[in-house]
Amino acid sequence: MDCNASNNFREPWPENVVLYQPYETEQILLAENASCLAVKAYLKMCNLSFHIRSCANAEFMSPGGHMTKLPVLQAGSFIFSEFTPIINFVKHKGEELGTWMKEDEKLEMRTYVSLTENTLTMAELYISFMVKRVYDEFTAPRNGCMHPWPLNKIQNFIKLRQAKKLLTVYQWKDMEINDVLTKVCRCCEILQAKLQESSGLFFYGEKPCELDAIVFGHLFSMLSLNLPDTALQSIVQQFKLLMKLCHFIDEEYFQKKSESSLKISCTSIPLTSAPIEKMRLNLANTVHEEAMRAYNKQKQQQQQQQQ
């Protein structure tokens, strides 16, 4: 990192921070919603100002990521995506939660954060893409809703292939649904046991930390999105302490501080950032390239079968 970038990191929190995400009502998927909720909860817990901007191509604005690629945070000249990189940026700004925690507590907390993110994100992706009813009735319609035919079909094909690849990397793709639900249940048991040890409302006492934010993001997403299959929701509802935590965070940080003043439409703020604009313009090219690769692969398979 050069000297100018280092100095920018040390500057105060910018006033024009924008959080990009897909449309909540029509488009956002389960795992994406969980990640976006977790980031919003963390920023609100830090009492940091930001604007929420919903747009159809939020995923294509992302500079990268190892799971959902969302949300995308633009803070001045910096662009970050997903929960951990965004939280690390907040820490560099000196605005993070948990400064009061001991070092061993921070290390322990990061272990719980990793467990939560890896287990619940994979479970959300599995339910969304590997359970046929959920995919047909929820995932595919929402993922393709912002694209005209046949781009919606192409986009669904690309998204399904990406999800299966990620599930394969984490060795979740070939699991049975009962194995997935067992892992979710075990994760919730571990989290509830940790919450029971706390003397306060949150995992580490009377003040929130990033574990509270990420647990809220995933569990509240499972509870609030209307999936055709309610297996995940039923599991979460068994853990009363976790349910209580989610409802408290929702009321304290989302209901009391209405998001209406923070939400902005896609046309209310121009895209002045060159990197964001460039990524937006690349959307059509990306979809076209993926479509051509899929077409050529299918054509080659047909030729091989004929031979």
Specify the residue positions occupied by each region the protein language model found:
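Pan-eukaryotic secretory-pathway lumenal catalytic ectodomains of glycan-active enzymes
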Residues: Q237-Q307
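Acidic carboxylate-rich catalytic motifs and surrounding loops in phosphoryl-/glycosyl-chemistry enzymes
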Residues: I52-E59, E206, E259-I269
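Short amphipathic alpha-helical interaction elements and helix-loop-helix interfaces
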Residues: Y23-T25, M45, S49, I79, ...
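GST-like fold's C-terminal all-alpha helical module
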Residues: M122-H247, Q307
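A diffuse structural propensity rather than consistent per-protein peaks
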Residues: S81-E82, C209, T272
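GST-like domain detector, emphasizing the conserved glutathione-binding G-site
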Residues: M1-F157, F203, I276-Q300, Q307
